[in-house]
């Protein structure tokens, strides 16, 4: 870390960091950055407030769109898996979205290590959203539980999993060395624990303090990333925290929003903007960038939700026109959540016989709704290509829908 760049930071301070690097075995005498407690709201330029307003408007439209969805659980599944794939990719864990969507059909032994790690994020986010619905607030204990779920079964699943870290960590750089790192967060110990407690208290006072929710989410994400309180999973948890805070503050009522695809496509600027806050106190540049990301993400999510609902309506119209009801109709309705199916999976999910499920799948194939992907006679694999395209493909750039 370039200590000279952060030496005069107006939002934090450098502290000594000495020890022996456990990865390289080399002693180091370096510094780490400890952020100050968050301000209530930093002064922002007019252009930044306009970006914040546009983000708030887009979030409001997503909120309204979610309220109009008759079965939101069907949409939570694909949108969360899309977010899981993208937020993991930002951290160097890659699994094709098609595999993430079809993972329930695979034997666990057939899943790659990367795919298992992406699915950990799905479980982690599901738990977090469920806890908020139960009325739990964000606490250090909750964050520790979430981190433990996130790293379960991975190399980071050590005795330290689920605990605030007790070792130094380094972010980026040419090697694993702390000295070569792009950024070195706060060292372990009382200051890190106090900083995390201050952040949690700030999150839970945000609504009462009358802070703008978009600005608050930007500040919280910066602070969490800068503290880096865990040995692993900080980036993914930090992006999950954006959605958790918007839900806790009542800006959103459903967890459909995915923020990572936008940040993933701008990874270098994302990292640079965070660093510029620590080095120069550039809240304005970070919050404007963040607000642009929230606006684009909310707009994209809402447009994909509408695209999925359009696909569902088209499927149901085809089924009605063919005079089909029962299990085939129910299957057509559920494809926006489960775009990859096998006959066995349909039978298990519906509680019907294998033959009934097979007949339903065959009828949807005849209608062009499902397509067989394997070319086999046993363990045939089917896909709803229109649903996959709505999740993966380009989406209209128009703002009004």
Residue ranges and their predicted role:
Residues 1-401:
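FIC/Doc superfamily catalytic core
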């Amino acid at each position: 870390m370039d200590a000279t760049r952060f030496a005069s930071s107006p939002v934090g301070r450098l502290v000594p960091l000495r020890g022996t690097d456990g990865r390289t075995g080399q002693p180091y005498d370096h510094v780490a950055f400890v952020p100050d407690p968050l301000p209530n709201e930093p002064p922002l330029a007019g252009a930044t407030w306009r970006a914040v307003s546009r983000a708030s408007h887009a979030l409001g439209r997503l909120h309204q769109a979610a309220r109009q969805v008759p079965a939101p659980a069907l949409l939570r599944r694909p949108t969360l898996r899309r977010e899981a794939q993208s937020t993991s990719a930002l951290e160097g864990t890659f699994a094709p979205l098609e595999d993430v969507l079809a993972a329930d059909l695979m034997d666990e032994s057939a899943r790659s290590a990367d795919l298992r790690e992406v699915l950990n994020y799905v479980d982690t986010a599901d738990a977090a959203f469920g806890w908020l619905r139960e009325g739990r607030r964000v606490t250090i204990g909750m964050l520790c539980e979430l981190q433990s779920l996130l790293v379960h079964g991975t190399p980071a699943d050590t005795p330290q999993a689920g605990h605030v870290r007790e070792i130094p960590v380094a972010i980026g750089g040419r090697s694993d060395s702390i000295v070569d790192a792009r950024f070195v967060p706060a060292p372990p110990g009382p200051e890190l624990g106090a900083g995390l407690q201050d952040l949690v208290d700030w999150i839970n006072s945000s609504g009462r303090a009358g802070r703008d929710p978009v600005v608050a989410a930007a500040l919280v994400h910066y602070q969490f990333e800068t503290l880096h309180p865990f040995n692993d999973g900080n980036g993914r948890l930090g992006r999950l925290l954006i959605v958790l805070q918007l839900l806790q503050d009542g800006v959103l009522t459903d967890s459909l929003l995915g923020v990572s695809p936008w940040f993933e496509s701008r990874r270098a600027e994302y990292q640079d903007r965070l660093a510029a806050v620590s080095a120069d106190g550039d809240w304005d540049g970070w919050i404007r960038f963040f607000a642009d990301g929230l606006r684009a993400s909310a707009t994209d999510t809402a447009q994909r939700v509408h695209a999925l609902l359009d696909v569902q309506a088209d499927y149901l119209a085809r089924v009605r026109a063919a005079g089909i009801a029962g299990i085939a109709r129910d299957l057509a309705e559920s494809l926006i959540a489960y775009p990859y199916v096998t006959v066995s999976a349909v039978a298990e999910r519906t509680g019907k016989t294998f033959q009934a499920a097979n007949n339903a799948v065959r009828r949807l194939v005849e209608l062009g709704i499902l397509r067989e992907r394997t070319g086999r006679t046993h363990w045939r694999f089917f896909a709803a290509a229109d649903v996959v395209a709505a999740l993966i493909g380009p989406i209209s750039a128009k703002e009004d829908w």
